[in-house]
Amino acid sequence: MKKKIWKSSASIEDLIKRSNIISNIRLFFSKKNILEVETPILSRSTVTDVHLTSFETNYISSDNIDELKLWLTTSPEYHMKRLLASESGSIYQICHSFRNKELGRYHNPEFTMLEWYQPFCSMKKFIKEIDIFLQIILKCNKSDKVSYQDLFIDFLKIDPLCANLLELHQISKKLKLDHLTHSENNLNKLIQLLFTLKIEPNIGKEKPLFVYHFPAEQASLAAINLKDPRISERFEIFFKGIELGNGFYELIDVNEQKKRFIRDNKERRSMNLPIRKIDNFFLSALSYGLPPCSGVAIGLDRLIMLILNKKSIHEVIAFPVDRC
């Protein structure tokens, strides 16, 4: 029988459940007096991160003379931080985000993101807040917490903050991964590969796990730890072998942020990727003054997939990319 691809890939029953879950999420934030905000999906700039590929489009004036390049946002992060600098206080947003070259069991080019920021909140305190959120929404047990360093030592018997390339290649060979790693000479990329292939699928099986203090090389937009410059104030959330969220105690130093953007673009050039225009609106907000804060981005489709006990996010989205 021919597949009815015009129909929703999620059942109507599951779409009703999805709607109820999102209502409960909004209720959670409403009870905490956290402001729900809306920011643009179109942006004049995009991310420099080498791991993200943005969708781009063009605005054309009514007389067809002027053209403005725009990007679909990979997350609402930069716009929400501009609101934080405008003294919005604690905020959250549920919105669609867009990432090219991402499609699979846990990926769709268009997906739903929950992003949440809490000013004057340490990473440790924010993790406790997110844990409460997960217990309420997922109806799960209290989470575990472990450092990135300790995970590597527990699983692979190696310290990622001290290891050299030779040691990592020896571990890769022992794990029979050398066919994937033998040509990799970037220490940080090799560490990330080992984490993705050998640690990530095996953590957070029974309850959510917060992995914190990622190496400084993987800081992204997180601050560097003041006591140990080898680590960042970045954390990720895993449950049942799936990455659910990514969070930071946020970098607020405009000069350091600009350096990271420039470094990203240098890496893009070395990888023959397009150089990205730096978001000067965002840098201006940092220059004006972003309050010390923590933030997290949670993949809402993945969260709902776990709640409804589905095997793919395509079972909880009405029209994924093959049906849109």
Swiss-Prot record:
EC numbers on record: 6.3.2.-
Family annotation (Pfam families): tRNA-synt_2
HAMAP family: EF_P_modif_A
Catalytic activity, as annotated: D-beta-lysine + L-lysyl-[protein] + ATP = N(6)-((3R)-3,6-diaminohexanoyl)-L-lysyl-[protein] + AMP + diphosphate + H(+)
Taxonomy of the source species: Bacteria, Pseudomonadati, Pseudomonadota, Gammaproteobacteria, Enterobacterales
Gene Ontology CC terms, in alphabetical order: cytosol
Name of the molecule in the record: Elongation factor P--(R)-beta-lysine ligase
GO biological processes: lysyl-tRNA aminoacylation
